[in-house]
């Protein structure tokens, strides 16, 4: 995974992400609700969020919880100006880094990541490694995308991430964690035209692994 390219694409999309990322917003709200339901308040004291972006999930979470300390992380330092309202709170801090290095303080009660780990080189290794950062009774909560994500575009370009199925993830995680909740859901977006699809992907940074621009032939094929 070219992290430099991914960072550059998301940095370019940071201004439009919060407006255009409709699916990610739905996921963020559902995940925040699930954490409130399945994780006791004592498990939300010291929190680490991986891949916070512009704070979409963060704000949803903070409407439902009041952690004593919240460390926000993202690959892109360019997101920090979009977090200024959150960082005005002395309990909340931001650090830009590649989260896969797992260079974070231990003693976390909760590690969360919303719609981010699909961009990791070794998501399973990262998720297993989070165990050593958690307290003995700590929780790991995350959402990601599955193999059916943007399949219409993938069928044409073959540009795709190595998405994991829910079963693949639960099989791996069962060795390190007791799974208290898992869910898979298909969310559908409709667009007025094929070009609107591509615009949406660009404005949400989802073109992060494609190195070249679309050719005229690819564009014509996609629009048919």
Annotate each predicted stretch with a short phrase.
Residues 100-111:
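A short acidic, Gly/Pro-enriched loop at the edge of an enzyme's catalytic core
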Residues 22-43:
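Conserved alpha-helix/loop element of class I SAM-dependent methyltransferases that forms part
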Residues 137-196, 205-216:
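Conserved catalytic/acceptor-binding region of the Class I
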Residues 1-15, 29:
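N-terminal, positively charged/glycine-rich alpha-helical extensions of SAM-dependent methyltransferases
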Residues 124-136:
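A short glycine-rich, Lys/Arg-flanked "PGG" loop and its adjoining helix->strand segment in the class I
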Residues 48-102:
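Class I SAM-dependent methyltransferase SAM/SAH-binding core
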């Amino acid at each position: 995974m070219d992290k430099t390219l991914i960072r550059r694409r998301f940095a370019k999309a940071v201004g439009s992400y919060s407006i255009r990322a409709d699916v990610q917003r739905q996921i963020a709200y559902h995940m925040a609700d699930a954490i409130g339901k399945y994780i006791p308040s004592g498990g939300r004291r010291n929190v680490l969020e991986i891949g916070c972006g512009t704070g979409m999930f963060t704000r949803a979470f903070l409407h439902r919880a009041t952690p004593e300390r919240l460390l926000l992380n993202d690959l892109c330092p360019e997101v920090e100006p979009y977090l200024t309202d959150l960082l005005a709170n002395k309990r909340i801090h931001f650090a830009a880094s590649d989260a896969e290095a797992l260079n974070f303080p231990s003693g976390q009660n909760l590690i969360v990541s919303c719609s981010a780990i699909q961009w990791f080189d070794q998501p399973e290794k990262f998720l297993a490694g989070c165990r050593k950062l958690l307290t003995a009774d700590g929780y790991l909560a995350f959402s990601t995308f599955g193999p059916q994500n943007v399949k219409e575009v993938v069928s044409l370009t073959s540009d795709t991430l190595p998405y994991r199925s829910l079963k693949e993830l639960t099989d791996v995680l069962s060795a390190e964690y007791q799974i208290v909740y898992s869910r898979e859901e298909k969310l559908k977006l409709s667009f007025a035209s094929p070009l609107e699809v591509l615009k949406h992907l660009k404005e949400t940074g989802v073109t992060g692994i494609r190195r070249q621009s679309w050719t005229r032939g690819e564009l014509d094929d996609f629009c048919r």
